Each structure stands twice: as structure tokens, then as C-alpha cells.
A protein has these predicted regions:
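Amphipathic alpha-helical binding modules
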Residues: 68-95
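Hydrophobic alpha-helical segments at protein termini of multi-pass membrane proteins
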Residues: 3, 8, 47-50, 68, ...
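Conserved, well-folded catalytic cores of nucleic-acid-processing
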Residues: 10-14, 36, 40, 84
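Amphipathic protein-protein interaction modules
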Residues: 40-75
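Feature detects long, helix-prone N-terminal segments enriched in hydrophobes
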Residues: 32-36, 80
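Charged, alpha-helix-enriched surfaces in structured cytosolic catalytic cores
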Residues: 2, 24, 28, 32, ...
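A short, ordered amphipathic alpha-helix with a cationic face
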Residues: 4-6, 23-24, 35-40, 49-53
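Charged, compositionally biased N-terminal leader segments and the immediate start
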Residues: 1-26
């Protein structure tokens, strides 16, 4: 639940409206996030970079990805976003 709230918050901070319902199924979250990232990479690259900055996805991890296939790249970036957002929620709850 807090993970979804964090994702929605960071996307809205980046002016990329997204509103995942709190009750979203994990597979559906992954699929919708993948689609959103794919569209950002393809059509709104500057906004995509801004989103990565706001979420604070490590730049070195992004640079390690192979960008030759946008579908695979978007899936890998979506995973990094989920991982970073989960870390934020975990740290906030732990400390």
C-alpha cells in the first residue's frame, strides 16, 4: 500500500500523472508501470529523465542497461523504479 502511494507521489512530482489504485495487483502494477515507462522513453524522453531524477534511480544502474530494445529497456527501468521506491518505503518505516 505505501509502495503504491510512494510511486503515485513521485510520478505526480514529476508532472507525470499516474494514479495506481491502492488495491492494484502486483502483476498489474508491473505491467502498467512498464507501459508508462515505455511511452515516456519513446515519446517524452526529457520527462523520463526528470522522473528518474525525482525517484532517484542510480544513474550507474541505468547506464548498465542495454538500450537496443526499448521494450526490454522499459521493463528493466520499471524494475529499478520499483526497487528504489520500495527502498524509500522500507527506510521510512525502519527509521
Amino acid at each position: 500500500m505505501k509502495l503504491i502511494e510512494q510511486i503515485n507521489k513521485d510520478f505526480n512530482l514529476a508532472n507525470e500523472s499516474i494514479d495506481f489504485p491502492i488495491s492494484i495487483d502486483p502483476e498489474e502494477l508491473k505491467a502498467q508501470l512498464h507501459e508508462k515507462i515505455y511511452r515516456l522513453i519513446q515519446y517524452k524522453f526529457a520527462e523520463y529523465l526528470n522522473l528518474l531524477y525525482i525517484i532517484d534511480v542510480p544513474e550507474d544502474q541505468i547506464k548498465k542497461l542495454d538500450g537496443s530494445d526499448l521494450v526490454i529497456l522499459a521493463e528493466q527501468v520499471a524494475f529499478l523504479i520499483l526497487k528504489r521506491e520500495w527502498m524509500k518505503v522500507w527506510f521510512r518505516n525502519k527509521y
